[in-house]
Amino acid sequence: MNNKNYFSFLITKFRFKIFVLIIFLILFSGNTQIFSQDEIEIVESIPLETSLENSDLPRTLNVWLKMINEAKESVDIETFYFANEKGKPLEQIIAALKDAAGRGVIVRIIADSGFYSKNDKSVDELEGIKNITIKKIPFSNLAGGVMHAKYFIADKINVFTGSQNFDWRALIHIHEIGIRVKNKDMGRTFSELFETDWKLCDNNFYGITNMAVHFFVNKDNPVTVSSDKYGQVMMYPAFSPPDLNMPGLSSEEDELIKIIDYSKNRLLIQMYSYSPKTRSKEIKYDRIDNALRSAASRGVKVKIIFSDWAIRDEATDFIKSLSAEKNIEIKFSSIPQYSAGFIPYSRVEHCKYFISDNNISWISSSNWEQSYFSNSRNATIVTDNIRINEELEKVFYRSWDSNFTEKVDIDRKYESVKRN
């Protein structure tokens, strides 16, 4: 080989090595955004005929349908209940689940047994279909509360959780906030919770006490998810009740209080209900209340929207007292009725989220009452990301600045609103 050919050979070999090195660095340097399969969406349900319809966030119905329609192996749903009516949008979800089962996807559903026994039985539409199994979890017997979580997982990797029940009204007549995360570690953590509750449907506690927990995503082991829209997002889930959480899972209530306690500048909170009520008439639940007052006393600006369904008995006095604190502003939200007439159990802000400072966001199924943390199954995702925080800030102020919210008047006598 002459010098010229040898030199060309060396150049070609060098270029090939550089190419291999670049590919190696892309794949293994930790910069997963380029080829990342992770996805994040903040998902909103909007009551029709309201100013909230200006939101450009993905709608719950569309996100759920996409998740189910793209599922290849499994769909696991844990929800408080199903409520469908002929011609309403939940029919599309039920049809999608049937179609998924028809193409071989294994569908499992957990619903609360107590609510099912006394209320809507729309989940029965899926009974007896090949590849679909439905179980009822006796949460009242297990922990004294209800299975109040609203989450599902497609293919063990694509997770949705939030305030949305599998209720047709939660798709078009109730304000809801949820989050979809496609990430294998988050999917695995939620899937293990589902497997535990699947066993608990049969009163089998083995799943709680004998579970390997080294891979769970939690407050001490958060995951960083790469998203085209939001960039790098650090996140972890938290669950209730602690007594029925597997070892290694974070507690919702503890994380909630910690975030409030660590807040330095602001808290924007939108919550369906808030109450000091406990099982004992002599004891009031004031852990969140004390944390909010403490935050306000150190200069944190606190704004809260409660739905008008929070107006009941002593809860109203509790809210009035909180609103009298310096640095705390509270409004009640009253969604206008639908033009076609009154719809029971609808036209309400059912959201359960808040943001802290400019980076922490909380999206949950828990209302702010003791039983939701101590006795009921609920799920939350906590994120650390400025863009998600900004997204939820927009959601908050669309309600805060709307014509259907008004500041709490401590001198006014409020009456409970009609629900059904």
Language-model-detected regions and their locations in the chain:
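Bacterial N-terminal signal peptides
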Residues: K17-G30
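Bacterial N-terminal signal peptides that target proteins for export
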Residues: N2-V20
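Charged, low-complexity intrinsically disordered terminal segments
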Residues: T32-K135, F139-N420
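Intrinsic-disorder/low-complexity regions
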Residues: M1-K4, G30, R293
